[in-house]
Curated annotation (Swiss-Prot):
<keyword id="KW-0460">Magnesium</keyword>
<dbReference type="InterPro" id="IPR000836">
    <property type="entry name" value="PRibTrfase_dom"/>
</dbReference>
<feature type="binding site">
    <location>
        <position position="99"/>
    </location>
    <ligand>
        <name>GMP</name>
    </ligand>
</feature>
<protein>
    <recommendedName>
        <fullName>Hypoxanthine phosphoribosyltransferase</fullName>
        <ecNumber>2.4.2.8</ecNumber>
    </recommendedName>
</protein>
<comment type="subunit">
    <text>Homotetramer.</text>
</comment>
<comment type="similarity">
    <text>Belongs to the purine/pyrimidine phosphoribosyltransferase family.</text>
</comment>
<dbReference type="GO" id="GO:0004422">
    <property type="term" value="F:hypoxanthine phosphoribosyltransferase activity"/>
</dbReference>
<dbReference type="GO" id="GO:0000287">
    <property type="term" value="F:magnesium ion binding"/>
</dbReference>
<comment type="function">
    <text>Purine salvage pathway enzyme which catalyzes the transfer of the ribosyl-5-phosphate group from 5-phospho-alpha-D-ribose 1-diphosphate (PRPP) to the N9 position of hypoxanthine to yield IMP (inosine 5'-monophosphate). To a lesser extent, can also act on guanine leading to GMP, but shows a highly less efficient activity with xanthine.</text>
</comment>
<keyword id="KW-0328">Glycosyltransferase</keyword>
<dbReference type="GO" id="GO:0000166">
    <property type="term" value="F:nucleotide binding"/>
</dbReference>
<dbReference type="GO" id="GO:0032263">
    <property type="term" value="P:GMP salvage"/>
</dbReference>
<dbReference type="GO" id="GO:0046100">
    <property type="term" value="P:hypoxanthine metabolic process"/>
</dbReference>
<feature type="binding site">
    <location>
        <position position="43"/>
    </location>
    <ligand>
        <name>diphosphate</name>
    </ligand>
</feature>
<dbReference type="GO" id="GO:0005829">
    <property type="term" value="C:cytosol"/>
</dbReference>
<keyword id="KW-0660">Purine salvage</keyword>
<feature type="binding site">
    <location>
        <position position="159"/>
    </location>
    <ligand>
        <name>GMP</name>
    </ligand>
</feature>
């Protein structure tokens, strides 16, 4: 489908906000005696976590989880499957889930349930982009980069049909008729 990309959040705005998020996260966890582990939900959050982890000024670990709720189609089945599980044990650690974008929150809510069973000391969420008007479940997001309207976004790791992850900014996809 033909489309164009309109810049919504510039590379400079992303850099400034990621730096601020790093400072907020550092402040929250700097006095904790328990380790902090950042968990990136792949694939979309890989660029965000790469930049964010360098802005957090306390010792931390990083791990990755890949989930799927789409089966073979483009509509979520609601059944969350873990494609790649964590390598690290999160028992008694401060866990910070790092997301690229949160809309309905259904998949994230199920991931939270799975991780809670592993008894972390704390479980928090950081997202680059939040679409609060799309929320279908009640979840508390501790750190939000940008609240955005319900529009299709790409760039900075977020894709459209596996394209546009490389863009250094967040852009809105405008479909042409």
């Amino acid at each position: 489908m033909k489309h164009t990309i309109k810049v919504i959040i510039s590379e400079k705005e992303l850099d400034i906000r990621v730096r601020e998020l790093g400072e907020e996260i550092t402040k929250k966890y700097k006095n904790s005696k328990n380790k902090i582990i950042l968990i990136a939900l792949l694939r979309g959050s890989f660029v965000f976590i790469a930049d964010l982890c360098r802005r957090i000024k306390i010792e931390h670990e990083i791990d990755f989880m890949t989930t799927s709720s789409y089966g073979r189609g483009m509509i979520s089945t609601g059944d969350v499957k873990i494609i790649k599980d964590l390598d690290e044990d999160i028992y008694n650690k401060n866990v910070l889930i790092v997301e690229d974008i949160i809309d309905s929150g259904k998949t994230l809510s199920k991931v939270l349930g799975i991780l809670k069973l592993r008894n972390p000391k704390s479980l928090s969420i950081c997202t680059l982009l939040d679409k609060p008007e799309c929320r279908e479940v009640n979840i508390n997001i501790d750190f939000v980069g940008f609240s955005i309207p319900d529009e299709f976004m790409v760039g900075y790791g977020i894709d459209y049909a596996q394209s546009y992850r490389y863009l250094p900014y967040i852009g809105k996809v405008i479909f042409k008729k």
